[in-house]
């Protein structure tokens, strides 16, 4: 079995998820769930530091706990929970950006958002025209886990809804063990909308 590449998640995600869970379920219930977590991750879940970086394994474990304990293995409820966590998280990091943004504008910032909350594995590209965006994730070998695919679609839906107050149509186009392509359709305000392409990858050097 191939070794997974290094990947870390910023603590602000755990803080947002913890705050959201405590608001909905109360301290006692959340503390009970945390006590059922892997011993090595309990301190992360109990008192996450927003600026700290935590291993991908702790994030994957958190997703599993949310799905099994909080959502009771209900995919629709799991996505609703992730949307709530995402809204809290993006409002912490990108509040001013979202307040004045269109769906198209904020989706072009998805690669930047990725680098704000993740480091290590993975690249993100956005291809956009009119009222459609395709967000492609590559070199991130966690997409074989269906929870990561649900996480991604729910997060994109929440980001757009936060800035437009409308839910876009979000659909998985294709995925492999380390890639995922998602199509987002939304209302496009301007009549003319040029083609946009943004990426976490550095631009290619001009050949001589």
Question: What feature does the model see in each segment?
Answer:
Residues 38-46, 88-89, 176-186:
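Short, mixed-charge aromatic SLiMs
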Residues 27-40, 79-80, 108, 167-177:
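Short alpha-helical "patches" and their helix-cap loops
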Residues 2-15, 115-150, 163-208:
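Short terminal or interdomain "cap/linker" segment that borders an active site or interface and mediates
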Residues 31, 35, 95, 99, ...:
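A generic signature of intrinsically disordered, low-complexity regions enriched in glycine/proline
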Residues 48-151:
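Amphipathic interaction/junction segments at domain boundaries or subunit interfaces
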């Amino acid at each position: 079995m191939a070794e997974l590449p290094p990947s870390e998640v910023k603590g602000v995600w755990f803080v947002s998820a913890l705050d959201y869970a405590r608001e909905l379920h109360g301290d006692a219930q959340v503390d009970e769930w945390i006590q059922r977590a892997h011993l090595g991750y309990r301190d992360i879940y109990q008192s996450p530091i927003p600026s700290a970086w935590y291993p991908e394994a702790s994030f994957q474990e958190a997703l599993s706990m949310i799905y099994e304990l909080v959502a009771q293995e209900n995919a629709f409820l799991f996505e609703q929970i992730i949307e709530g966590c995402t809204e809290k998280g993006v409002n912490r990091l990108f509040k001013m950006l979202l307040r004045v943004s269109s769906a198209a504008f904020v989706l072009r910032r998805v690669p930047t958002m990725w680098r704000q909350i993740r480091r290590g594995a993975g690249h993100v590209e956005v291809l956009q025209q009119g009222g459609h965006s395709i967000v492609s994730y590559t070199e991130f070998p966690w997409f074989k886990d269906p929870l990561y695919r649900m996480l991604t679609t729910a997060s994109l839906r929440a980001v757009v809804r936060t800035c437009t107050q409308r839910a876009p149509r979000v659909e998985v186009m294709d995925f492999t063990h380390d890639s995922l392509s998602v199509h987002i359709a939304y209302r496009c305000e301007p009549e003319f909308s040029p083609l946009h392409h943004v990426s976490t990858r550095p631009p290619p050097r001009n050949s001589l």
